[in-house]
């Protein structure tokens, strides 16, 4: 690989010298913040927590592969191939939330602001409420993704040929949103008006929830593995191309009939995106190890990490937007204080 070549943007600003390099020493699949501590989720067994200037502290959470993880800033919830759902809080305390009775793999996890946790094993989605009441729902095929709605206790369960919307506290039959194909990651817009899935094919699909009108977002050269809502939820940033693709969601029709913005193009595929919590800025990671910060209004770029390494697996901002963490698949990682 060659050194980073900004092409026409030869005057690109670099902050690479301000990045604190971290050697996690193991493959990384995700990163989240617990308060001001960056927590790098390993592919196997452990989470590596970095607090202040200290070296990464290893916390054992599973007896095998870590298949999924999510966080609300107060705790990280993970699912593993040991059939367990585990929580790690900011104090470093590990607690078991659930163990699948059949020891099936825990493929997906989701967190609700009120403390409810959802997870899936095979074709079954589970919810444990804040009062420890557990409920389950079977869907036609293996669950591909889970997401809680921002308002009310409603869970979106993505699977083959559509998404099931489940109100676990209501007796009504779950609502089914149909669209042919395999639906994986799923996300509600912050204003609760839209639902979007990343599909097994190189495309996104969406529904306007007021009338279930379809929204088709295509044109990707590869599968979309990372999506992030902008601050305020007016746009959706996505990986899957050699630029960050941002779909507009400011109007009542969402992206229907509109072209997406294309930011930070490189000669490498975008593998991870993370939007700043308050400002119109995003971080983008690429398959060649590059990390950029991008101002969404005009596309201005700042180089955070040069290429020449493994693909970027994960990016995360802390809640204040003052720290950016990134990690490559091979465990090379970094922290940037803004």
Task: For every predicted segment, state its role.
Residues 1-338:
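WD40-repeat beta-propeller superdomains and closely related acidic/aromatic-rich repeat-like regions
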